[in-house]
From Swiss-Prot:
Source superkingdom: Eukaryota
Modifications the protein undergoes after translation, according to the UniProt entry: Not N-glycosylated.
InterPro entries associated with the record: Folate_rcpt, Folate_rcpt-like
Name under which the protein is recorded: Retbindin
Compartments where found: Secreted, Extracellular space, Extracellular matrix, Interphotoreceptor matrix; Cell membrane
Membrane topology listed for this record: Peripheral membrane protein
PANTHER family: FOLATE RECEPTOR, RETBINDIN
Cited function: Riboflavin-binding protein which might have a role in retinal flavin transport.
Gene that this polypeptide is encoded by: RTBDN
UniProt source species: Canis lupus familiaris (Dog)
Predominant location: secreted
Disulfide pairings: C73-C143, C80-C120, C113-C157, C126-C139
Cleaved signal peptide residues: 1-30
Length: 223
């Protein structure tokens, strides 16, 4: 019991970090300029900066559309937009579970950063860093791609997410990953789920995107 009480503040701090990341993915993950965000998001950002959080501010529709790029830079690729959207939703769901004490804090797997970089390397990004959030700025005037801005996946995650969500070392045992199945159907029909694979000795949590009616479409090896 004492141990559970000791870990609760750390989980809450990590959940606040996830909240910041969730907002960043909606604000700049798709390169939407920060000034275009609603007043609610600016208030939530300020609350995070002072260590206060109003949960009622979280479910605002304005943050659900990553992939909004400045017109002169062109549209984002469907793959990158979809990946960022699922990552945003997954982190938001993770944030709720952390606040409830159902899940413990885990850093991102380095493989997730590599997939993010590979998926979005030709897409436009805001700049080398999206932090600090309270700084009023939009995307840089020139249209730079992920590949031009970041050296690799690790550089991407560290530059973009900073202290808000740490990245585990390659091959680390305890980390959070995301696996997105590119399946037909609208986004509303897809559901992000957290799946832990018990076979592996490594305690990795995978956020698997699959249809709600599916029963585990296999990316695992057969018997």
């Amino acid at each position: 019991m004492a141990n559970r009480g000791h870990t609760q503040p750390r989980a809450l701090a990590w959940a606040l970090g996830l909240t910041l990341v969730w907002i960043l993915l909606g604000a700049c993950g798709g390169s939407r300029p920060l000034p275009a965000l609603s007043r609610r998001h600016h208030r939530l950002a300020a609350d995070l900066g002072t260590g206060q959080l109003h949960l009622a501010e979280m479910d605002t529709p304005e943050a659900s559309g990553p992939g909004m790029v400045s017109e002169h830079c062109g549209k984002p690729s469907p793959g990158c937009e979809s990946f960022l959207g699922h990552l945003q939703v997954a982190l938001h769901n993770r944030f709720r579970l952390l606040l409830l004490g159902i899940r413990q804090a885990q850093p991102l797997c380095s493989e997730l950063c590599d997939i993010w970089f590979a998926t979005c390397e030709s897409d436009i990004t805001c700049g080398p860093t999206w932090l600090p959030l309270l700084e009023k700025r939009g995307c840089e005037p020139r249209c730079t791609t992920y590949e031009q801005t970041f050296a690799d996946g690790a550089d991407l995650c560290r530059s973009v997410l900073g202290y808000a969500l740490p990245v585990a070392a390659p091959g680390a045992d305890h980390c959070l990953n995301i696996s997105i199945s590119v399946l037909p159907g609208s986004r509303q029909e897809r559901k992000a789920q957290e799946v832990t694979f018990p076979r592996s000795r490594r305690s990795r949590t995978w956020i698997l995107d699959a249809p709600g009616s599916g029963s585990g479409s296999g990316s695992g090896s057969g018997p």
